[in-house]
């Protein structure tokens, strides 16, 4: 009989989290994801249209016992357009549990733009763990550590200089935010 049938789903104890990379165009959001997930870098600039979701499975050490927790991180790469950000905010940002707000360390005008991204996301999901990343750190930096400290003090979040090209601090950024989200979800 049909009523006796059950859908059997694979059981998993893997925690799933949704992280969003946000910021203006051409700051390296897609390249950071590529470096983190695939361990490589592509010199070509390819604009993201709409959104692109990539996943990576991690084993995260948590707690005093350093217990390994299996985590599936879903990384949402959002097109750097303000118009799209505001138009599609409910669709893209619903369920976001952490933000990597990315600016270009060589273009200081990209740092204050992050405030608009943060406000838009927070309107949808509330105050979630956030890291500010000043990407392209392998080049001559036009944003000083002091500027980043002042900017991030208002947000109450850490910042890192990252380089998708060399891999500098990329793993640290994604792993750090993942742990912050897990601590936020399970206080």
For each of these PLM feature ranges, what is it?
Residues 1-187:
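TRAFAC-class small GTPase G-domain
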């Amino acid at each position: 009989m049909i009523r006796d049938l059950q859908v059997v789903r694979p059981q998993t104890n893997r925690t799933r989290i949704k992280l969003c990379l946000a910021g203006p165009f051409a700051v390296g959001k897609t390249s950071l994801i590529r470096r983190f997930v695939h361990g490589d870098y592509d010199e070509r600039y390819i604009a993201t249209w709409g959104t692109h979701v990539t996943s990576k499975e991690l084993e995260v050490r948590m707690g005093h016992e350093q217990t390994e927790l299996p985590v599936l991180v879903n990384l949402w790469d959002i097109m750097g357009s303000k118009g799209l950000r505001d138009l599609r905010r409910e669709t893209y940002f619903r369920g976001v549990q952490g933000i990597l707000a990315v600016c270009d360390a060589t273009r200081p005008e990209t740092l204050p733009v992050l405030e608009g991204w943060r406000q838009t996301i927070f309107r949808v999901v509330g105050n979630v763990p956030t890291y500010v990343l000043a990407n392209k750190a392998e080049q001559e930096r036009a944003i000083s550590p002091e500027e980043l400290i002042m900017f991030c003090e208002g947000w109450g979040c850490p910042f890192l200089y990252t380089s998708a090209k060399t891999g500098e601090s990329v793993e640290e950024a994604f792993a750090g935010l993942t742990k912050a989200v897990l601590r936020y979800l399970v206080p």
